[in-house]
């Protein structure tokens, strides 16, 4: 128990020394603040530099990822269907595909898959 406390004390001392050494060596100046400020042809930028993000693109990308992951989940079912003597793998995969198709038709009816409106 005492050796663990000694190791913890040594680690604490090393951490404090490294922290203080970093604070002493660190040089912050006015030029660092200027380097981090926006610069555009000698003037501050008049508009926000970030481009607007299309929410329709984000929604389409999320839908694509969801269906992509679901297809990856379907791939092992093919070997289960071929190697099984029961109808359970086929039934479960049909239920899963039905749920996928219902979700796809719902997204289609909501207009989430239409890129241009």
Swiss-Prot record:
EC number of this enzyme: 7.1.1.2
Record keyword Disulfide bond present: no
Keywords, alphabetical: Electron transport, Membrane, Mitochondrion, NAD, Respiratory chain, Translocase, Transmembrane, Transmembrane helix, Transport, Ubiquinone
Membrane topology: Multi-pass membrane protein
GO CC, any one term: NADH dehydrogenase complex
UniProt entry tagged with the keyword Transmembrane helix: yes
Catalytic activity from the UniProt record: a ubiquinone + NADH + 5 H(+)(in) = a ubiquinol + NAD(+) + 4 H(+)(out)
UniProt subcellular location: Mitochondrion membrane
Annotated TM spans: 4-24, 57-77, 88-108
Molecular function terms, GO-annotated: NADH dehydrogenase (ubiquinone) activity
InterPro entries (UniProt xref): NADH_UbQ/plastoQ_OxRdtase_su3, NDAH_ubi_oxred_su3_sf
Role noted for this protein: Core subunit of the mitochondrial membrane respiratory chain NADH dehydrogenase (Complex I) that is believed to belong to the minimal assembly required for catalysis. Complex I functions in the transfer of electrons from NADH to the respiratory chain. The immediate electron acceptor for the enzyme is believed to be ubiquinone.
Family statement: Belongs to the complex I subunit 3 family.
Protein name from the UniProt record: NADH-ubiquinone oxidoreductase chain 3
Source organism per UniProt: Heterololigo bleekeri (Spear squid)
């Amino acid at each position: 128990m005492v050796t663990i406390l000694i190791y913890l004390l040594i680690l604490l001392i090393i951490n404090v020394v490294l922290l203080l050494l970093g604070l002493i060596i660190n040089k912050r100046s006015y030029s660092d603040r200027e380097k981090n400020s926006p610069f555009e042809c000698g003037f501050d930028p008049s508009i926000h530099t970030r481009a607007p993000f299309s929410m329709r693109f984000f929604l389409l990308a999320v839908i694509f990822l969801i269906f992509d992951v679901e297809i990856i989940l379907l791939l092992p079912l093919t070997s289960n269907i071929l190697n099984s003597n029961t109808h359970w793998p086929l039934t479960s995969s049909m239920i899963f595909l039905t749920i996928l198709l219902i979700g796809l038709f719902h997204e289609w009816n909501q207009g989430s898959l239409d890129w241009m409106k």
